[in-house]
């Protein structure tokens, strides 16, 4: 995922 693009972490 990226800096602020994770569904659950």
From Swiss-Prot:
Predominant place of localization: secreted
Entry keywords, A to Z: Amidation, Disulfide bond, Hormone, Secreted
Cell compartments where the protein resides: Secreted
Molecular function per GO: neurohypophyseal hormone activity
PROSITE patterns in the cross-refs: NEUROHYPOPHYS_HORM
Highest taxon, organism lineage: Eukaryota
GO cellular component: extracellular region
Positions of modified residues (Glycine amide): 9
UniProt KW Transferase keyword: no
Disulfide pairings: 1-6
Cited InterPro entries: Neurohypophysial_hormone_CS
Family of this protein: Belongs to the vasopressin/oxytocin family.
Role noted for this protein: Potentiates spontaneous contractions of the gut and also pulsatory contractions and bladder-shaking movement of the nephridia. May be involved in osmoregulation of the animal through nephridial function.
Protein name: Annetocin
């Amino acid at each position: 995922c990226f800096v602020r693009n994770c569904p659950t972490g």
